[in-house]
């Protein structure tokens, strides 16, 4: 089975070793064909507390780590400061 990956933006880093990542999914409406965007918020494991609000990150699915945490940060693609 393939590993699921998503790319999103960190919207909250107030928890210890956990960040909230918003992933935008864009798709055409089945009847009207207008592009619709839906945002899903994932609680993601961040072992070293490296992520900050505004960072663009790649997340991967993992084993359940808590009641609501099933994803882990794979890499920080861009930081809020722009590097």
UniProtKB/Swiss-Prot annotation:
One of the GO BP terms on file: translation
Domain of life from the UniProt record: Bacteria
Molecular functions (GO terms): rRNA binding; structural constituent of ribosome
Transmembrane segments: none
GO cellular component, one term: cytosolic small ribosomal subunit
InterPro entries: NA-bd_OB-fold (IPR012340), Ribosomal_uS17 (IPR000266), Ribosomal_uS17_bact/chlr (IPR019984), Ribosomal_uS17_CS (IPR019979)
Disulfide bonds: none
Keywords: Ribonucleoprotein, Ribosomal protein, RNA-binding, rRNA-binding
Family, similarity comment: Belongs to the universal ribosomal protein uS17 family.
Biological role: One of the primary rRNA binding proteins, it binds specifically to the 5'-end of 16S ribosomal RNA.
Assembly description: Part of the 30S ribosomal subunit.
Protein name: Small ribosomal subunit protein uS17
Native source organism of the sequence: Synechococcus sp. (strain RCC307)
């Amino acid at each position: 089975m393939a590993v699921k990956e998503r790319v999103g933006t960190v919207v909250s880093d107030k928890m210890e070793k956990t960040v909230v990542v918003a992933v935008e999914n864009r798709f055409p409406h089945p009847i009207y064909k207008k592009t619709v965007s839906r945002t899903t918020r994932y609680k993601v494991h961040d072992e070293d507390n490296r992520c900050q609000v505004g960072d663009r990150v790649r997340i991967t699915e993992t084993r359940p780590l808590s009641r609501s945490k099933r994803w882990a940060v794979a890499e920080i693609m861009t930081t809020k400061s722009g590097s």
